[in-house]
Amino acid sequence: MSPEYFLRSLLLIILATFSANASNWLYLAKLSSVGSISEEETCEKLKGLIQRQVQMCKRNLEVMDSVRRGAQLAIEECQYQFRNRRWNCSTLDTLPVFGKVVTQGTREAAFVYAISSAGVAFAVTRACSSGELDKCGCDRTVQGGSPQGFQWSGCSDNIAYGVAFSQSFVDVRERSKGASSNRALMNLHNNEAGRKAILNNMRVECKCHGVSGSCEFKTCWKAMPPFRKVGNVLKEKFDGATEVEQSEIGSTKVLVPKNSQFKPHTDEDLVYLDSSPDFCDHDLKNGVLGTSGRQCNKTSKAIDGCELMCCGRGFHTDEVEVVERCSCKFHWCCSVKCKPCHRVVEIHTCR
């Protein structure tokens, strides 16, 4: 084999690996709906899936719209949590949807993997509970009386099914590679941390029964937390994420803190391998839109403040007129009427 042929072959392998980035399935969020998938051949046309995900799609046609909703949930929550950060989870119309930000082993990639695996688990579980799927329903293992004195009843969220489907669908690329590279280990860890954010925050919801509103006895069921709660938990984990490196315990490859003085991470924590860029400058090649034109808070000293958000470049101040509702009065029955009030406010945007 000639050196030139070897190099060309190696380049093709690298490009193929990149094109099959493990988060490419998030492109499903760009589709208006995949609920119309009724034939296996349609799965082949879904952009962003690797072959094993295509096979899962063919075996689980009815679940794919839940996967799409999970991807949308993940992107929307990411954009909410990072709305005041330099990197605000902006998406592109290409693969991967977050650009090369998620192909690097950064904190941001850790959060994306965690929130997206949680999104699929959440959306599939919700579809089970609402009766949308034939393959699953409510969690029937939660039955009978409880030590607290209430009766398990109602429709408990079948989180076990949602988590299992998320593991099978989202983790498939890393699993197919044998999960031996440090990046595969990082992705798998953060995927599981995302699902743990749901599992560890399951709630007990109850309904009282009795005469005249009394609570003679209660029936209760287990419910997932709101997805905003999941996002809040993972955002805290992002802020406290642990930088790790690969090590070996016997023949097993594991991730350990890069700084031995730091306490070991748990299954619930996010981990990362590489330092993040500053996200200040426009770099579309890497999916970084920069902060020029972003609104900032003139009085804040935090990351949303103009000094930090604008990376020291300064900012523009414009006055704009906004119309708000004021002098609202309740009219019997049953409406609220308000007057329009005009107010001039200052808007600060990064140079």
Curated annotation (Swiss-Prot):
- List lipidated residues, O-palmitoleoyl serine: 212
Looking up InterPro entries in the UniProt record yields: Wnt, Wnt4, Wnt_C, Wnt_CS
Q: What is its main location?
A: secreted
Cellular component (GO) terms are: cytoplasm; extracellular space
Q: One matching Pfam family, short form?
A: wnt
Q: Is Signal given among the entry's keywords?
A: yes
Q: Where in the cell is it found?
A: Secreted, Extracellular space, Extracellular matrix
Residues spanning the signal sequence: 1-22
Keywords, in A-Z order:
Developmental protein, Disulfide bond, Extracellular matrix, Glycoprotein, Lipoprotein, Secreted, Signal, Wnt signaling pathway
In its UniProt record, a GO molecular function of this protein is: frizzled binding
Q: Which cysteines are joined by disulfide bonds?
A: 78-89, 128-136, 138-155, 206-220, 208-215, 280-311, 296-306, 310-350, 326-341, 328-338, 333-334
* Annotated tissue distribution: Predominantly expressed in the diencephalon neuromere D2.
Q: Which GO terms describe its biological process?
A: canonical Wnt signaling pathway; cell fate commitment; kidney morphogenesis; negative regulation of androgen biosynthetic process; neuron differentiation; positive regulation of cartilage development; positive regulation of skeletal muscle cell proliferation; positive regulation of skeletal muscle fiber differentiation
Q: Which SMART domains match?
A: WNT1
Q: Read off the CDD domains from this record.
A: Wnt_Wnt4
Does Hydrolase show up as a keyword for this record? Answer: no
Q: How is it modified after translation?
A: Palmitoleoylation is required for efficient binding to frizzled receptors. Depalmitoleoylation leads to Wnt signaling pathway inhibition.
- Per the UniProt entry, the glycosylated residues are 21, 88, 297
Annotated family: Belongs to the Wnt family.
* Complexes and interactors: Interacts with CPZ.
What the protein does comes down to: Ligand for members of the frizzled family of seven transmembrane receptors. Plays an important role in embryonic development.
Protein's name according to its UniProt entry: Protein Wnt-4
